[in-house]
Amino acid sequence: NPRYGILLCINGTGIMNSWIRRNVTQETLDYAEMNRLAASVPAGSEGLSVVPFGNGAERMLCNRCPRAGIIGLDLNRHTTAHILRATQEGIAYSFRYGIDIMRGLGVRPDVIRAGAANLFLSPLFRQTLSMLTGARIELFNTDGALGAARGAALGAGYYKTRGEAFAALRRLEVVEPAEADR
C-alpha cells in the first residue's frame, strides 16, 4: 500500500537568514538579537521587501532559479532592522506561496507543526507565518533533522504507528493566527 505525501521545501530560506547575518550584520548579532531588532520595525518593513530565493532551484517554482533580492531599499530610511524584518517577512511570504500551491492540490493545512528551532525561534516569524497562512502553529521540542529521521523511521516500519514515532515530543507553544491582523 504505497503512501504519498507533499513536501514543502523552500530551498533559500535558511541560507537567506544566515547570509543576512554574515553579510549585513557582519556576525555582530546573534539570531536572538536579530529577532529582537526585526520586531522593532513595523509590519511591511516600511516598503522594503526581501525575496529569499537565492540558493538554487526551487521545487515549488518548477525548479526555476529566481535568485534573491532586496527590493525597495531607501537609503535615507531603511536600517539593518528593516532588512532583518523584511527578510523574515519574505521567508514567511514564500512559505505562504508554498501553502497556496498545496491548497491548489486539495491539501488544507490548518496546523503547521514545527520544531522549536531555526526561524521558528522568532516570535515575529511565527506570528507573521500564522497570520499569512491562517494556520495554527504548534512548536515541539525537536528540530527538522530529528523530525525527518522520525518520519523516515516510520516509513521504514521501525515504528508501528505515527503516535509511537512522535510519542516523546512535547508541544511547547501554540500560535494562533490573529484575526485582527488578517
Regions from the language model: what does each represent?
Residues 1-182:
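Glycine/Thr-rich phosphate-binding loops that ligate phosphate moieties of nucleotide
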